[in-house]
Amino acid sequence: MTKSDLIEQLAASRMHMPAKDVEAAIKEILEQMASTLQNGDRIEIRGFGSFSLHYRAPRVGRNPKTGDKVELTGKYVPHFKPGKELRERVNIIE
């Protein structure tokens, strides 16, 4: 599902809200989440999961094209940990 798909589905299920308003709300939610992570804070949505930053230490990588070794600097990357309810909901055993 893409962001556009999400906006379309939410607008269809919320007849009283125009797609333009749904799109603005989704964009604002995502912007607030990005800003929170950028500030180094954690986001927790109960029943869904939490977003945080994980540090990746500097390391020596390899250029896949040439095979040359490349020094990679340390960096922070977003990390998502699903909540118990989400894990149980998607654990479909057939």
Swiss-Prot record:
SUPFAM superfamilies: IHF-like DNA-binding proteins
Signal peptide (UniProt feature, chain positions): none
Pfam families: Bac_DNA_binding
Cystine pairs: none
GO process terms (BP): DNA recombination; regulation of DNA-templated transcription; regulation of translation
Gene3D superfamilies cross-referenced by the UniProt entry: IHF-like DNA-binding proteins
Name assigned to this protein: Integration host factor subunit beta
Gene, per the UniProt record: ihfB
